[in-house]
Design a protein with these regions (language model features):
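Proteins with a high burden of low-complexity, intrinsically disordered sequence enriched in S/T/G/P/A and R
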Residues: 1-3, 137-138
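Mid-length scaffold segments of soluble, non-membrane domains
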Residues: 3, 14-34, 38-41
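Periplasmic OmpA-like peptidoglycan-binding domain that tethers envelope proteins to the cell wall
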Residues: 11-19, 44-124, 135-149
Length: 149
């Protein structure tokens, strides 16, 4: 989601939604209530490294926290929790502005309305046809290799 003024959804290093983002999410959430399809929610960060001495909390956790903060806002606005089928953090792996990886507009969420096929693949696993009529190869025992001298 990017608003028409290209404001960031989050401050740098924060998972707290900006007040205008709460309003936008409530509007988007209301519009999605009438859609039958399930929703996937992704959180994103810019490429600024999260300062934590290389341990623990990183842009991966931050992006997941952003996705969950957005999920909580959508649910508090009336979206049924079961409508959200996936909430995930993407860190800086899918930048909105790849030519400007530190751009504040990269600090965002993505809301995807899933097709029925994508939902089935995600929830039920993709079914793969297995050939049950072909005989498996017969195991064979190979002679031992001569020792190298």
């Amino acid at each position: 989601i990017v608003d028409d003024q290209k404001r960031p959804m989050f401050d740098s290093g924060s998972a707290v939604l900006k007040p205008y983002m709460r309003d936008i999410l409530r509007e988007v959430g209301s519009a999605l209530l009438d859609v039958e399809n399930k929703i996937s929610l992704d959180g994103h960060t810019d490429r600024s490294p999260y300062s934590n001495d290389g341990r623990g909390y990183s842009n991966w956790e931050l992006s997941a926290d952003r996705a969950n903060a957005s999920r909580r806002e959508l649910v508090s606005a009336g979206m049924p929790d079961e409508k959200l089928v996936r909430v995930v953090g993407m860190a800086s792996s899918l930048l909105l502005e790849p030519d400007n990886p530190l751009s504040p507009s990269n600090r965002r969420i993505s809301i995807l309305v899933m097709t029925k096929e994508a939902e089935e693949r995600l929830l039920g696993g993709e079914r793969v046809a297995v050939d049950t009529e072909t005989e498996p190869p017969t195991p064979s025992i190979l002679p031992p290799k001569p020792a190298l001298r």
